[in-house]
Amino acid sequence: MTQDILHRYLFDNADVRGELVQLQNSYQQVIGSHAYPPVLQTLLGELLAATSLLTATLKFSGDISVQLQGNGPVSLAVINGNNLQQLRGIARWDGELADDASLADLFGQGYMVITLTPDEGERYQGVVALDKPTLAACVEDYFNQSEQLPTALWLFADGKQAAGMFLQILPSQEDHNADFEHLCQLTATIKAEELFTLEAQEVLHRLYHQEEVRLFDPIEVSFKCTCSRERSAAAIKTIDQAEVEAILAEDGNVEMGCEYCNAKYLFDAIDIASIYANGTASNTQQ
């Protein structure tokens, strides 16, 4: 299977668009820096695939965030990305999590926030409750509320690989529900193992061999963290200088860590003085 690729496709005889994403390296980079319980590894894989599929529907340059929050043992799971399919993510949890825990078990009274931030234009935010049995169903609910277009998703993850498929009726073609339902029935026969092991062309042939499918050029998906020494310096400047200097006196340096990729940035006394004087550290060493 080609790793970390998203495919978009259309049906020549139906007003429906589709997407298929297969992830491995980017998924491993999201979960590899943290000791996530198996159920959280699976959830983050599904969330990563869902965010990639959502990102492919964007019609602008900018950022996307898909965030799950609640009052259960998992307080946060989030994937952030952009229109270039560059993604990163984290989760926060407390205590033991059962391998078969449901969304309700993990998040309690939870909700999903999808935030779209164009480089130009106004930010959009949609919120839906995590009151469906699966993450895929919750994302479908978001589309039903925000775009009011019939949409279906299938999400899979096993701690090693993640994958997903997406179908949606094209805008202004909502009366073609019969075609959409037929294609959903075909797509629902997909198995995780097929998405994890087969090339996209073979998957589409197995599902839609009686349909005329037009497959577009593949899009690479990657893990990309946006942390930097400069951003860490800017964060330090928001802290009271006396507090930072107390840490410096005790430890000899100030360490800033990234939650997403676990990168560490060290700042010594000269750096700290430069940050509060000029807003930037005096050197560029990590």
From Swiss-Prot:
NCBIfam families per UniProt: PRK00114.1
Record-annotated disulphide pairs: C225-C227, C258-C261
Organism: Shewanella oneidensis (strain ATCC 700550 / JCM 31522 / CIP 106686 / LMG 19005 / NCIMB 14063 / MR-1)
One Gene Ontology term from the biological process aspect of the record: protein refolding
PTM remark: Under oxidizing conditions two disulfide bonds are formed involving the reactive cysteines. Under reducing conditions zinc is bound to the reactive cysteines and the protein is inactive.
Cell cycle recorded as keyword: no
Molecular-function GO term, any one: protein folding chaperone
Keyword set, alphabetical order: Chaperone, Cytoplasm, Disulfide bond, Redox-active center, Zinc
Underlying gene: hslO
Name of the featured protein: 33 kDa chaperonin
Highest rank taxon of the organism: Bacteria
Family label: Belongs to the HSP33 family.
Organism ancestry: Bacteria, Pseudomonadati, Pseudomonadota, Gammaproteobacteria, Alteromonadales
One GO location term (cellular component): cytoplasm
A Pfam family per the record: HSP33
Family annotation (PANTHER family): 33 KDA CHAPERONIN
Gene3D superfamilies found in the cross-reference section: helix hairpin bin, Hsp33 domain, HSP33 redox switch-like
Function: Redox regulated molecular chaperone. Protects both thermally unfolding and oxidatively damaged proteins from irreversible aggregation. Plays an important role in the bacterial defense system toward oxidative stress.
Entry-linked HAMAP family: HslO (MF_00117)
Cellular location(s): Cytoplasm
